Amino acid sequence: MSNDTSAQPAQSSLSFTQGLLVGQLSVVLLIGAFIKFFIFGEASPSSSRSQTRRTSPHKRSYSISGARDLGSRSLKEKPSSNVLRPVPSSSTNTRSILRKTYYSANPTNFTSKHGRHRPHHSTHQPESLDWFNVLIAQTIAQYRQTAYILKDSPTSSILESLATTLNNPEKKPSFIDDITVTDISLGEEFPIFSNCRVIAIDDPSSDGGRLQALMDVDLSDDNLSLAIETNLVLNYPKPYSAILPVALSVSVVRFSGTLCISFVPGTTQTSTHLATSPSNIDPTLQTNDYSGANRRGNRRQERTDTEQATQANNAGTTGIPKTSLAFSFLPDYRLDLSVRSLIGSRSRLQDVPKVAQLVEARVQAWFEERVVEPRVQVVALPGIWPRMGRTGVRGQEEQQEVGSSGNAGVSTANVSMLGARDAGAEGSHATRDADMEGLRYRRNASPGDETSGVRYSPQNQDSREQACRDDPFRIPGSLPDVVPVT
C-alpha cells in the first residue's frame, strides 16, 4: 500500500509539469504565428528563388496567394516618381492662399501707360510692421558691429572692398587716378517700415499669378556717408602732364519710398529672365540718357556684370531650382543727398554746384538701374532645413565655429549672436560704441604706421570734430589748409 501511495503523487506532479510546458509552448507558438502572419509581411523573392520558380513547371499556385502578391506588388513596387504626391494647382493659386489666410486683396488693374500696371491696393487693413522694424534694426546693428570688428582684416574689410570696387580698372576712366577712401560712416539710425499691404499681380511664369507685398520705408540718417580723394589726370600731350586734386563727400540725408517684395518660383532661368528681359526695361529710363553713347555703353556693361554676378550666385545650386526673393522700389521714391566737394591744390574751390549735380545724377542713375521698377534684385533664399552644421547653443559663453572654416580669423565670441559676452567685453564694447559716433573708419594719418589700416582714435576724432565746428566748410577726410578763392 505504501508503494502505491508514493507512485500517485509522482505521476500527478509529472503530468502537471508536462501540461505546464505544453501550455507555455502552445502560447509561444500562437504568439509567433500571429506575429508572422498578421504583423510581418512576406520577404521579396531573391533572384535565385525567382530563377528556381521559373525552372520548376510543376509548382502550383493558389488564387488567394496570387491576389495577395498582386496587392503587395501594387503597393511596394511603385515608381520612385510617384512616391511624392502631386501638389494640386488650387493650393498654389493666389486666390486659394488669400482665402486660407483670411486676407482680402484686389487683383491688379493693368494699364498701357509706359507699359506698366497700376495695382489696386488691398482692402485688408495695412500692417504696422513694428516687429519687423525691430528685427531689421538688430540685423543692421549686427552688420555694423561686424564691419567694425573686421576693420583690420586684409580680405574682409569694408574699406578694402570699397577700394577694390572703386579702383576697378575695367570701369574706372583713364583720366581718374587711384581713389582713396578717407571716411566711411555706416550710420546710426535704422529704416522704418510701415503700411504693409499685399496685392495680387499677374505673372505669366506662374499659374494664377503671384502675390506682392508693398511697404513704405523711411530712413533719415545724417551719419550715412562716404568720403573719397582722387586726382584728375591730364594725359595730353604726355601722360600725367598735370593733376587736379579732388575730394568728395556724399551723405544720404533722407530716403523714402515704397518697397515691393515677392517670391519668385524656383526655376533655373528666373534671375536671368528678370534681369535681362526686354519687357522689364522701362522706355522712360532708356530715353533719360544724359551722357550719350558712353552712358549707354556703361549701362550695357553694368547689366552684363549683373547677369554674370547672378549666374555666379546661382552656380552653387548645380541645376537645382531655388525659390528666390525679388525686391525693388516704386519710381516715386525720394533720395536726398548732401554732396560736398573740394577741388584744387593751392587755390581750392569748395562745394561746386555743378559737381554736386553730376554726383547726384550718377547716384540716382546707379540706384534706378538696379532696384527701381521695372528692374528688380533677385536673391536666392538659403535652405532652412535643420542641419547639425548650423546648430548652436544659446547662452554659451564660448562658441566654436561649426561647419564654417572661412571665418577662422574672427573671434566667434564677438560676432556670434548666440554666445553671451563676458562683463569685460561688454564694458569695452559700451565704451567703444559711446566713442565711435556712427562707426566712422578713418585712415591713420601717421606715415610710420606699420599696419596702414583703418584705426580709430578718440583724441583724433575730437580734434577733427573741433576743426569741423570751427570751419563749417571742412569735409571729413578732405585736403588740409583750405584757401579761399580770391
From Swiss-Prot:
Q: What's the name of its gene?
A: MMM1
Q: Which residues lie on this side of the membrane: Lumenal?
A: 1-19
A GO MF annotation of the entry reads: lipid binding
- In this chain the SMP-LTD domain maps to 125-382
Keyword Phosphoprotein assigned:
no
Residue stretches of biased makeup (Basic and acidic residues): 70-79, 429-440, 462-473
Per its record, how is this protein called by name? Maintenance of mitochondrial morphology protein 1
For membrane topology, the record states: Single-pass type I membrane protein
Question: Gene Ontology cellular component?
Answer: endoplasmic reticulum membrane; ERMES complex
Residue ranges annotated as compositionally biased, kind Basic residues, are: 51-61
